[in-house]
A protein has these predicted regions:
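Glycine/proline-rich low-complexity spacer/linker segments in large multi-domain proteins
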Residues: 76-89, 156-211
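Short, hydrophobic/aromatic-enriched beta-strand segments in well-ordered soluble domains
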Residues: 47-49, 64-66, 147-161, 211-219, ...
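N-terminal, polar/Ser/Thr-rich
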Residues: 18-44, 488-489
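Acidic/His/Gly-enriched intrinsically disordered linker/tail segments
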Residues: 376-444, 448, 465-466, 482
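A surface-exposed beta-strand-loop module
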Residues: 52, 92-172
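Hydrophobic helix-coil surface modules that form long, contiguous segments used
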Residues: 185-193, 201-352, 381
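Zinc-dependent metallopeptidase catalytic helix centered on the HExxH motif
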Residues: 340-401, 458
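Amphipathic alpha-helical substructures
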Residues: 431-495
Length: 495
């Protein structure tokens, strides 16, 4: 009898392990219509959000992110930055130099905000309350397991002066609008529960879904970002099909219509002076580049396209296939910063790192707050490998990460990799842990398993967990299966 029970238990455990990549996930579909006023830097928005509760839980409330509200004097993001400014590394303040004390000095027409004007679920008005960057909605009727509801929202927003990631009018790049985290975004609900994480300028975590976005804006503006432009032959600006003579609608505005399938965020940027170039990397993939020559030459910008084309076969062979039909490198007010199918770049130098984020942030989608090193570190590792390929270099590609990590250890400021991204005591410790120590995690894994096996692990991890929000235990489980080695000790010692 004991033998039968043990056999049954073993079968159940094996079945559970094999089924792990099919872990349930919520699903969303956004349909949004935006009307932008480039004189006031404000926009009106309508959002229809179809929400699938694929969990076995009954949901009595939901949460939205309202990221723009962080850019107001006295916000949590403002207070955190001021606190970090009082922490010194030598004589250098620990604050992000892009943020510093700038939020507290914003004028009323320079702050960011997102105001909810109305919200219904299945046509019934819902009570809600704002707490800075989080909107809590206590539902009048619960969302049952395995059911779908529809939220309709009317909102208005003001684009903040460029400080961090999203914003307007960076004086160096002179890009007018860098529109990330610009819409009320449903928080993620997963096997751990809700993740209504206040925004203090760090990481993101989103629900997989489809986006249908229409943006009405001054007809002189050129847009780039996430998604496929649906009305390219009416818009023009280099998006139109070859040979098409564009006939733009009459009036002072154009409506740009984008769709983006199976992504967890949507970014766009806009400027009247963008130069738009594109390169067909293969039959089903086009690279777009939108830039200005305000802080870098056209030659340095356009080299991105040829280098990306050269790197693509190596990247896909080593880390997995890129599944979308386009990728856009977009000059922005802050960056590099990664988004699905696109990146914002303040200059051409960070293009490779930000593009490679689309494998780890974009397609694997680990919770960046809990595991920032599995995004930044794995991306840094991939960047080291790809840059060595592009440079035809034979040296040790991870040297920079090792040097940075050694410096952190010697400083006495190292914190465990298990620290939540928002809870590191210093920005310095967070940065080195997330980028350098995460990079070294994969480099040393190759020392343990052998480089060829480590590469097989990365491809199998991508194959099994693409679009499924994996965590570190999921990665270790794949690594153990592929290598036929016990690796929990490595996770425990290093993480």
């Amino acid at each position: 009898m004991m033998k039968i029970l043990l056999t049954a238990l073993g079968f159940c455990l094996l079945t559970q392990m094999q089924a792990q990549p099919d872990r349930w996930q919520q699903r969303v579909k956004y349909t949004m219509n935006i009307d932008m006023n480039v004189q006031t830097n404000q926009f009106q928005g309508k959002q229809k959000l179809e929400y699938w509760n694929n969990s076995s839980d009954t949901l009595t409330r939901v949460f939205y992110h309202l990221y723009f509200n962080a850019f107001q004097p006295g916000s949590m993001m403002d207070n955190r930055s001021l606190r970090q400014g009082n922490i010194k590394r030598g004589s250098t303040p620990d604050w992000d130099p892009r943020v510093r004390d700038r939020i507290q000095n914003l004028k009323p027409d320079e702050i960011g905000y997102q105001k909810i004007l109305s919200l219904t679920m299945n046509g019934v008005a819902q009570p809600y309350k704002e707490d800075e960057t989080i909107l809590e909605v206590k539902l009048t009727k619960p969302i049952l397991p395995k059911s779908k509801v529809v939220f309709d929202m009317v909102f208005e927003a003001q684009v903040p002066l460029q400080i961090r990631r999203s914003g307007r009018d960076n004086p160096t790049t002179k890009v007018r609008y860098s529109m990330s985290q610009w819409y009320p975004k449903m928080c993620e609900y997963d096997y751990e529960g809700w993740h209504p994480t206040p925004y203090v300028g760090r990481e993101f975590y989103g629900v997989w879904g489809d986006f249908d976005v229409s943006i009405s804006i001054d007809s002189k503006y050129i847009l780039g970002g996430t998604g496929y432009l649906q009305n390219a032959n009416q818009i023009g600006y280099g998006y139109e099909d070859e040979g098409v003579k564009v006939k733009k609608p009459l009036g002072g505005k154009l409506t740009w219509h984008f769709v983006a399938p199976n992504v967890h965020d949507f970014m766009w940027a806009a400027d009247p002076d963008f130069i738009h170039k594109k390169l067909k990397a293969r039959n089903d993939l086009t690279f777009h580049l939108l830039y200005k020559t305000t802080n870098a030459t056209a030659v340095s910008w356009e080299k991105i396209l040829t280098d990306a084309d050269k790197a693509l076969p190596f990247i896909e062979k080593t880390f997995g296939a890129y599944p979308y039909k386009q990728f856009s490198f977009v000059h922005g007010g802050d960056g590099g910063m990664e988004y699905p199918m696109a990146t914002l770049l303040s200059g051409p130098g960070a293009w490779l790192h930000e593009w490679l984020h689309n494998w780890y942030y974009g397609m694997l989608g680990t919770n960046e707050g809990e595991y920032p090193w599995m995004d930044e570190g794995f991306t840094s590792y991939a960047e080291d490998r790809v840059q060595a390929f592009l440079d035809n270099a034979s040296g040790f590609p991870y040297e920079g990460s090792y040097r940075s990590y050694y410096a952190l250890v010697k400083s006495g400021k190292e914190e465990p990799l298990t620290t939540h991204a928002d809870h590191y005591n210093t920005n310095y410790a967070y940065s080195i842990a997330s980028y350098s120590k995460g990079d070294i995690f994969l480099a040393q894994l190759g020392y343990i398993t052998g480089d060829a096996v480590r590469d097989k692990i990365l491809l199998e991890y991508y194959r099994l967990w693409r679009f499924k929000h994996p965590n570190i235990s999921d990665f270790i489980r794949v690594a153990e299966k592929v290598s036929d080695m016990k690796l929990d000790w490595y996770k425990e010692y290093w993480v």
